[in-house]
Amino acid sequence: MAHSKAQRRGLLIILSSPSGAGKSTLAKRLRAWDSDISFSVSATTRKPRPGEVDGQDYHFVTVESFKQDVANGDMLEHAHVFGNFYGSPKGPVQTAINEGRDVLFDIDWQGAQQITNSDLGKHTLSIFLLPPSITELRRRLESRGQDDAETISRRMQKSWDEISHWGSYDHVLINEDLDETEEALKTIITATRLRRIQQPSLIEHARALQQEFEDLS
């Protein structure tokens, strides 16, 4: 990478899409591309699925504990989805961006708005993935073989609510080809890391230039 962790402030990279549009696959590819991108491990009140590891896939917590964290301001964002609570613990995110590491969020539009409006919002980069078509979106959901017909129908009904908020994101990509979309994401992230606000060391550099100019005058 062009800028080391010591030279920049980390990004909160928000990746949103309706279920089946490819965000989980692309999130994994981005983490494989750059070790400075870590995945935000969400807290949830739902039961663990087979193979899921507490603290790695999710932080599995009780409803009471979750609500207490929200009340204490310890959740960067939170939502109630399909009968369960989900949220992003704030502490680990704050630590990561202060150390120059990016944090990737695989969340819906409601969570994206909460993060963007938070005290860390100025460091966000939000990207929305659109499917090529609704027909293709359904085909992808069915081909995954993870959900029954009722769950797929419910996800499809929710998909338009998610898609309708595409205009509130910094960047929007149509994910027709995974490889092309991955390259576009890398380009966006690389450019955003160069924003002035992500490079606090520029202030000292500018002061040094001013001092040098005055010394030479």
Curated annotation (Swiss-Prot):
Keywords: ATP-binding, Cytoplasm, Kinase, Nucleotide-binding, Transferase
Function text: Essential for recycling GMP and indirectly, cGMP.
Protein's UniProt name: Guanylate kinase
Disulfide bridges in this chain: none
Domain of life: Bacteria
Domain Guanylate kinase-like as annotated: residue spans: 10-190
Catalyzed reactions per annotation: GMP + ATP = GDP + ADP
GO cellular component: cytosol
Subcellular location: Cytoplasm
Assigned protein family: Belongs to the guanylate kinase family.
InterPro entries reported for this sequence: GK/Ca_channel_bsu (IPR008145), Guanylate_kin-like_dom (IPR008144), Guanylate_kinase (IPR017665), Guanylate_kinase_CS (IPR020590), P-loop_NTPase (IPR027417)
Binding site residues for ATP: S17, P18, S19, G20, A21, G22, K23, S24
EC code: 2.7.4.8
Gene3D superfamilies linked to this entry: Guanylate Kinase phosphate binding domain, P-loop containing nucleotide triphosphate hydrolases
EC class (word): transferase
Alphabetized GO MF terms: ATP binding; guanylate kinase activity
